Amino acid sequence: MTEIAIPNGVETLGNYAFYGCSALATVTLGTQERSSSSLKTIGDYAFAETAVKSVVLPNGVSTLGNYAFNKCASLATVSLGNSLTAIGDYAFSDCKKLESVTFGSALETIGERAFASAKISSLVLPAAVRTIGDWAFYNNPLTAITFNDGLQSIGSRAFYGVSVQTLNIPNSVTELGSYAFSGCKSLETVTIGTGVTKISDYAFNTCSALTQISCPSVTEIGASAFKGCSSLTDIPLNDKITSLGNYVFSGCSAIESLVIPNSVTSIGSYAFEKCTKLTSATLGTGISSIPDYMFSSCSALTSVVLPENITGIGKYAFQSTAFTELPLTASITEIKDYAFKSCTKLTSVAIPDRVTKLGTYVFQSCTGLESAKIGGGVTSVPNYMFHGCTNLVNVELSEKVTSIGNSAFYNCKGLKSLPVTESITSIGTNAFYGCTSLTSVHLSDQVTSLGASVFYGCSSLTEAVLGTGITTLGSSLFRNDAKLKKVVANGKIASVSTYTFNGCSSLERIYINNTPPTGASSNTFTKVPTSCRIYAPAQTCQFYAQTTYWKDFVIMPWLDELEIVSTTPSMSFDGGEALDVKPDTKTFVIEFNRTVVNTDSVSAMLIRSGFPVEDQVLTVSYSGNEVTVIREGKDLPNDPYYYLVLTTSDKQFSILFKVTTVTGIDEPVVEKEVRLREYYSVDGKLLPRPVQGINIVKTVYEDGSIEVSKVYVKPEDCRR
């Protein structure tokens, strides 16, 4: 069947009357005279999925059922009589060639998806229309829409994706559905009448050409209402607005400045996220906290003016902004997770005492940050607080801070000293992982908890001294610390773990103040040289020598560090002035704080005015806690600066004295004028300046004579 004429006298075409008649192309409904037709009702699916090309409804038809002409792929024109009051749901949906529709004067309601996915380019609504249903003109290529003054409701997605450039919504409209004009990529200007007080969720979402909007009576703008409106430069915020939904202006990348009026009392998360040209924002007094993600990824934002009543900053609120200083008011007491993550232009931050709640990751990846101060309002540096702050050098913690969280300073490559006060009792896992500028670690006895991998990858670390509170050395604690030479564990270490010293290829000494700890495995000491010495209490050394993994190293008794107690004759060993010693003194006795043993490896050198004294022979012996130095040679000539230098396996002592004689006449000394003086290392390399230790000095005088001598330079002389 390709053609059918419905005779006059038929009042109703039932549901599915010609449904699926795929060859039916021509339909005549009743008499050709529209005013005399008796047809009143066309049922659901009556002509759905037919090949009909044109539809003319007689004036008598008042009801057009749901799906009546749904998916009529050849339908191009429709004329609706003046009796039709409602178009059923999906009536002309998916009629992909439908370009022209003439509405009758009685039409009040356009049903859900009535013309969805049609090809209508222009729309003029008759005066009687009150309601446009959800999805009614979804994805039509509409370039012009004329709304009637009596229109009251525009449904959800009613004009989603249409091509209109200008919209004028009349004052009569009181309801604007969600997604109503979402995805209208050509829409530039919108005027919303006074009847609309709420712009629903996603109403103009991704209208990327939208530059201007007027909505004088609106008090509430819903979630994502203008999200992705990347050409919008002026935000429609007046002093009637009270509420802004989630993502409301997210991705509005043309906005440069923002003022939120005092009337706004509610702002959702992500409200201005990714407004990449926004440089300044002023917030009104209506809100008391910055919502989560409010300005996240506003990469040009440098200035925010906050009212004094703001008490909190939400999660990710200012992530990836361009702040150079923190926007903190006197009332802020809480900063939540990730609040300033990746703010790479921050160079210095100070958390005041009034802040009592700090979230995790607050300053993660702030790669420009150089200094930080944490006030006394918090007791802990939260987990991941400064994670990845690669240029952080100086950290000041309040004495009220008692713990450092997991990964708090992870990969802070610029950190040169440990920000640990006497108040710290706990340091979390990975706290200083990858802090490659740390050279030494000294933890007080107050620290009782030390997590795994705390100093993993601290490649410049040479020394670590742990207080008496530490009783466990966790997994990977010093892993891959390739320059680490010395670890002193003053506490009663009960256990070590896998990888504790793994990769410590320069380790020379480990001090363990206990019997062999449990937990060592084949991975604990990987790459630690077998020449490394394990210092343990004397009574435990035999057990170390018999314990797997520990016995692979040199076991030594742990003795107190040598310190000078007194000298005979009296000499200065504590930085005082030089004391007189007789020129014929042959014996020097130095008393230490403990017994001197072979492994202390004591040696001696006599220095006069910076030069080693070559005509003197020194012999060193020790007994108990005394070291005796016997001098063989001529009497010592007058000089105000002699140093008896004692060197041990751990340190060096410089003992100062002077020699003066009250009788005898010194021969006059004729000073020769120096032409050139050069310094060499002991292996003959020319030096730009004297260095610590022994230097070879070549002096050329004006008379042509040359003098070569050895000079001993103290560390403090190098610093001068």
Regions found by a protein language model. Give the residues of each.
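Structural signature of tandem-repeat unit edges
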Residues: 1-12, 22-41, 50-63, 73-86, ...
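Consensus positions within tandem repeat domains that build extended binding/scaffold surfaces
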Residues: 14-19, 43-46, 65-70, 88-93, ...
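Residue-level detector of functionally pivotal "anchor" positions at catalytic/ligand-binding pockets or at interdomain
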Residues: 559-572, 660-686, 718-719
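Low-complexity "stalk/linker" and mucin-like segments enriched in Ser/Thr/Pro/Ala/Gly
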Residues: 573-579, 608-624
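Surface-exposed, short loops/turns at beta-strand junctions within beta-sandwich domains
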Residues: 631-640, 689-691
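C-terminal edge beta-strand
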Residues: 653-661, 709-711
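C-terminal tail/sorting-segment detector
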Residues: 696-720
